[in-house]
């Protein structure tokens, strides 16, 4: 996770740099708990639980219509 060990003041700067790189066409595989970042930048969101992929979808579908109960629970707890 690229922002997990950063001071809060640095998180936005790092995420903004990653957004710029993505917009310039760079391919990235990012593990993150920053759901706003994933929603904005990702082409695909993959959700894992206990080391298993339980859901994979476009950001629009992942956030608007999660299919797996574990994904629904996770999103309900962080998107309040």
Which positions does each model-derived feature cover?
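Walker B catalytic motif
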Residues: 1-2
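ABC ATPase "signature
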Residues: 56-57
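A short, surface-exposed alpha-helical micro-motif characterized by mixed small hydrophobic
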Residues: 38-40
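H-loop/switch region of ABC-family ATPase nucleotide-binding domains
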Residues: 32-33
């Amino acid at each position: 996770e690229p922002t997990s060990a950063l001071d809060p003041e640095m998180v936005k700067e790092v995420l903004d740099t990653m957004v710029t790189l993505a917009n310039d066409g760079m391919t990235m595989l990012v593990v993150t708990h920053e759901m706003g970042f994933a929603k904005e930048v990702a082409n695909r969101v993959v959700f894992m639980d206990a080391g298993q992929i339980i859901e994979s979808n476009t950001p629009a579908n992942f956030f608007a219509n999660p299919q797996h109960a574990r994904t629904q629970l996770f999103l309900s707890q962080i998107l309040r």
